[in-house]
């Protein structure tokens, strides 16, 4: 891929510009550190858009995650590929177990403020760079209100906690993480505005806005999930 660059780029400004451009794209990914210091960090942010190819679970199992840029996710239900587990809880939504896309355009903002964009041609990469630098950097002001409702009733939740307490008293376990679900019906929502509100409120170092056709994933996490570098894994 051919590369072009711009210098002394502000991370938050360019993040907002990229999010402004995401609405017209079916496949878009933005991963940002929000400027948080980290000894393992290579970039302030990474982004990609356009899909040369979309990869699902079967393609990934047959070697689809070999070298080259790919953006996407591994779903929780993928665990059944590695262990024989009971499916006690119904899956929420219609998300696939895994999905990645090979981007047409890739960009990275390096730690020294250099924005580097790669495309199939230098002319195409330069066109994208100009588009990004000219996009609006304002925070969006669309609807972001969500009213969450618990899946469990109060009685079900208390019953589950009391059962776990009994297991601890019996010595079956000594600690446990218990998760409960909340859902919100989306009537009107600006996903970019919501992500910006989440990111500005948390400044979480592992934040991501991921758009895969009709699926949109927003993440503002303080924790790294996993990093693999050659034969080393950090988690």
Segments (PLM) and residue ranges:
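Extended alpha-helical targeting/anchoring segments
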Residues: 1-235
């Amino acid at each position: 891929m051919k590369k072009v660059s711009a210098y002394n780029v502000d991370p938050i400004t360019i993040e907002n510009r990229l999010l402004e451009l995401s609405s017209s794209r079916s496949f878009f990914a933005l991963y940002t550190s929000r400027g948080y210091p980290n000894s393992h960090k290579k970039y302030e942010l990474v982004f990609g858009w356009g899909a040369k190819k979309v990869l699902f679970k079967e393609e990934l199992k047959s070697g689809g995650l070999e070298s080259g840029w790919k953006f996407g996710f591994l779903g929780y239900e993928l665990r059944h590929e590695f262990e024989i587990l009971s499916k006690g809880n119904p899956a929420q939504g219609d998300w696939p177990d895994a999905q990645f896309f090979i981007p047409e355009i890739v960009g990275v903002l390096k730690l020294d403020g250099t924005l580097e964009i790669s495309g199939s041609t230098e002319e195409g990469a330069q066109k994208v760079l100009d588009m990004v630098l000219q996009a609006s950097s304002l925070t969006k002001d669309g609807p972001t209100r969500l009213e969450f409702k618990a899946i469990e009733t109060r009685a079900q939740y208390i019953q589950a906690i009391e059962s776990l307490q009994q297991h601890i008293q019996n010595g079956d376990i000594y600690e446990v993480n218990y998760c409960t679900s909340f859902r919100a019906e989306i009537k009107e929502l600006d996903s970019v505005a919501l992500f910006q509100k989440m990111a500005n409120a948390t400044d979480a170092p592992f934040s991501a806005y991921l758009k895969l056709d009709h699926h949109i994933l927003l993440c503002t996490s303080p924790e790294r999930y996993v990093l693999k570098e050659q034969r080393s894994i950090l988690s």
